[in-house]
């Protein structure tokens, strides 16, 4: 655990605090924009959200745990569930650390789109990735 903490500190010092905060802000914004464009409701007050995770309400008719399993088994992407009264109602999609990268955001959005479409969620194909790319432009 101490080695991991040391490595994290080393990476942060090398990148610089301001650059790390900005990187997480950018990728968090791109993820949130992409999810919204897919017709998903973002969970919570977005004016006070964190940049490193996006809460998203699981759409009606979608099996949240089944979708998470498909994301992991089919695409190698893990998204989080919620706990307590929000379990089965909200996913947590991280954009922190290694996942605070353009390719990770775009791949996650594309994979989630496929899983949702297979599950019956109606959305405009490519809308999530397109919206995220506009944030990056």
Language model features with spans:
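Structural signature of PLP-dependent enzymes
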Residues: 1-29
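Short glycine-rich or small-residue beta-strand-to-loop segments that form or flank ligand, phosphate
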Residues: 12, 53-55, 92-97
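Flexible, glycine/charged-enriched surface loops at secondary-structure junctions
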Residues: 16-23, 39-46, 82-84, 119-130
